[in-house]
């Protein structure tokens, strides 16, 4: 009997604008329009080329790789305490990050213009691949055990911390990291030595946030593509304080996730798994740390932040109010936040579209409030 996932909605009866394919295509148009606009009006901007190449190759590689994942029986195990509608997703191939993350890294590596840029891209590629492998090991353990849990939280945290410390030691040796945090209106906060624990926290928090966001078809891949695009455009708008090479890297990663989205939109043919979501968070963090874009990442990645905070709040309140019977209060119907709306009766695709729109609005806000000299 086939493990192929069944669509959660009858796409034949849906309005054209509510179909997953249409929503994903419209998101792609927005991202391409942003890259073309940047190239047209910002000096030295070359964002469209890595975006186009990465998107095309990602679509093709995913088309080739999804049947391979299915043949290897890499079917997602759905958590039993999650929304019951998700049980129909059981068997959908996972670990899709293996197919597209390398595409973004390879295309992004071709935008280097000098030796220092090449080494920064190498460091970025290393930390992204390291997190991808950690996520892949976690996914593999889940699949072999037939459960939704792989590595222990402590084990995963230790591996992520070790990888992040190696990256930060590399960046510190090369003097790539500014000890201040750039803010709008020419304001900056001098962090001194504290920039290092902050950078480590960013890696751990951002990768966890993108991982939590990957719970609905197309949610994390769409939001990730938008945030990578926003980071790229703000790097170009910052002129001499920006970084065209890292902007090109961001667009290559945006293209990789946009191409993946064509297969990950509802009804999903493949999931990125921890393999993809942890790599996404690591790449976003690495770019932000190397380019002094922690503030733009905080604003543009607001949906990721909200997803993570919803889990923290839910757990804290439940533990703080737990009575002798072991039952505590819940702020949300279910965490992360996207499940709160889904359990409340909002259609999965509607939740995804609203989160995409929210991310798009936050990206625009981040561009308006970008750091200035």
Curated annotation (Swiss-Prot):
The chain crosses the membrane at residues 16-36, 46-66, 93-113, 120-140, 157-177, 185-205, 216-236, 242-262, 270-290, 298-318, 350-369. GO terms for biological process: cell division; cell wall organization; peptidoglycan biosynthetic process; regulation of cell shape. GO terms for molecular function: metal ion binding; phospho-N-acetylmuramoyl-pentapeptide-transferase activity; UDP-N-acetylmuramoyl-L-alanyl-D-glutamyl-meso-2,6-diaminopimelyl-D-alanyl-D-alanine:undecaprenyl-phosphate transferase activity. GO terms for cellular component: plasma membrane. It catalyses: UDP-N-acetyl-alpha-D-muramoyl-L-alanyl-gamma-D-glutamyl-meso-2,6-diaminopimeloyl-D-alanyl-D-alanine + di-trans,octa-cis-undecaprenyl phosphate = di-trans,octa-cis-undecaprenyl diphospho-N-acetyl-alpha-D-muramoyl-L-alanyl-D-glutamyl-meso-2,6-diaminopimeloyl-D-alanyl-D-alanine + UMP. It is found in: Cell inner membrane. Its EC number is 2.7.8.13. The keyword Transferase applies. It holds the Pfam family MraY_sig1. Pathway: Cell wall biogenesis; peptidoglycan biosynthesis. The keyword Membrane applies. It comes from the Bacteria. Belongs to the glycosyltransferase 4 family. MraY subfamily. Catalyzes the initial step of the lipid cycle reactions in the biosynthesis of the cell wall peptidoglycan: transfers peptidoglycan precursor phospho-MurNAc-pentapeptide from UDP-MurNAc-pentapeptide onto the lipid carrier undecaprenyl phosphate, yielding undecaprenyl-pyrophosphoryl-MurNAc-pentapeptide, known as lipid I. This is Phospho-N-acetylmuramoyl-pentapeptide-transferase. It comes from Prochlorococcus marinus (strain MIT 9313). The lineage of its organism: Bacteria, Bacillati, Cyanobacteriota, Cyanophyceae, Synechococcales.
């Amino acid at each position: 009997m086939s493990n192929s996932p069944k669509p959660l909605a009858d796409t034949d009866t849906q309005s054209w604008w509510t179909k997953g394919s249409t929503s994903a295509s419209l998101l792609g148009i927005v991202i391409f329009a942003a890259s073309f606009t940047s190239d047209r009006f910002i000096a030295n901007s070359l964002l469209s080329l890595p975006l186009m190449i990465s998107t095309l190759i990602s679509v093709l590689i995913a088309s080739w790789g999804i049947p391979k994942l299915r043949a290897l029986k890499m079917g997602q195990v759905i958590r039993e305490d999650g929304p019951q509608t998700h049980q129909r997703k059981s068997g959908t191939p996972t670990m899709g990050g293996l197919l597209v993350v390398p595409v973004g890294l390879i295309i992004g590596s071709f935008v280097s213009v000098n030796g220092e840029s090449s080494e920064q891209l190498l460091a970025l590629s290393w930390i992204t691949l390291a997190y991808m492998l950690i996520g892949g090991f976690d996914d593999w353990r889940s699949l072999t055990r037939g459960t939704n849990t792989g590595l222990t939280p402590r084990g995963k945290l230790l591996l992520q911390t070790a990888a992040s410390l190696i990256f930060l030691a590399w960046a510190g040796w090369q003097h790539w990291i500014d000890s201040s945090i750039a803010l709008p209106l020419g304001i900056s906060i001098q962090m001194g030595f504290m920039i290092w624990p902050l950078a480590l926290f960013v890696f751990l928090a951002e990768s966890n946030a993108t991982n939590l966001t990957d719970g609905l078809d197309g949610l994390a891949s769409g939001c990730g593509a938008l945030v990578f695009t926003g980071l790229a455009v703000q790097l170009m708008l910052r002129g001499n304080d920006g970084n065209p090479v890292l902007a090109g890297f961001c667009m290559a990663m945006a293209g990789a996730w946009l191409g993946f989205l064509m297969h990950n939109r509802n009804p999903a043919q493949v999931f990125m798994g921890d393999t993809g979501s942890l790599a996404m968070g690591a790449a976003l963090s690495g770019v932000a740390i190397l380019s002094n874009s922690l503030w733009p990442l905080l604003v543009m990645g607001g949906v990721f932040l909200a997803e993570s905070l919803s889990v923290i709040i839910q757990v804290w309140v439940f533990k703080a109010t737990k009575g002798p019977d072991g039952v505590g209060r819940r702020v949300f119907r279910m965490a992360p936040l996207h499940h709160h709306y889904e359990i409340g009766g909002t259609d999965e695709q509607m939740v995804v579209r609203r989160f995409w729109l929210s991310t798009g609005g936050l990206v625009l806000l981040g561009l308006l409030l970008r750091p200035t000299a």
